Amino acid sequence: MTLEILDIMKLLPHRYPFLLVDRIEDLEPGKRAVGIKNVTINEPFFQGHYPGHPIMPGVLIIEAMAQVGGAVAAITAGDKDDQVPYFTGINKARFRRPVGPGDVLQLQLELLSSRRGLFVFSGKAYVDGNLVAEAELKAVFAPRSQD
């Protein structure tokens, strides 16, 4: 299953500038997904991280992985229109190399477990086939806030 940006926006509450996934490829509900983030110089975080040497903050790479995991969790859980996935934990995070403008992040998420509404994922981020970051991520569903 492939999800384009409008499909992703139906599953996740994130919007610009914090929606960090452009497309999800090879989504297998209850198992795994591969997300794509095209990193451009127009990203707002590059203004301050770092001027003259733009590097995508590691925490945003983790967030991009979490968003792919959130989409997998949403598809796996089924009818959750009144709820949204919340990122609840990070374990074993490692950053292997910087990510910058022009890079295409490939975000590979594997669902390790899903019990009592807690989803645990193994996430890895690659650029050109090279591992740039990895982490274990956790998420739960909670009611969508009433605006």
From Swiss-Prot:
Cellular component terms (Gene Ontology): cytoplasm; membrane
Alphabetical keyword list: Cytoplasm, Lipid A biosynthesis, Lipid biosynthesis, Lipid metabolism, Lyase
SUPFAM superfamilies on file: Thioesterase/thiol ester dehydrase-isomerase
Catalytic site positions: H49
Substrates-to-products reaction catalysed: a (3R)-hydroxyacyl-[ACP] = a (2E)-enoyl-[ACP] + H2O
Pfam families registered for this protein in UniProt: FabA
Domain of life assignment: Bacteria
The EC number(s) this enzyme carries: 4.2.1.59
Keyword Thylakoid: no
Keyword Lipid biosynthesis: yes
Enzyme class: lyase
UniProt record, GO biological process: fatty acid biosynthetic process; lipid A biosynthetic process
Known role: Involved in unsaturated fatty acids biosynthesis. Catalyzes the dehydration of short chain beta-hydroxyacyl-ACPs and long chain saturated and unsaturated beta-hydroxyacyl-ACPs.
Similarity comment text for this entry: Belongs to the thioester dehydratase family. FabZ subfamily.
The protein's name: 3-hydroxyacyl-[acyl-carrier-protein] dehydratase FabZ
Taxonomic source organism: Syntrophotalea carbinolica (strain DSM 2380 / NBRC 103641 / GraBd1)
Gene assigned in the entry: fabZ
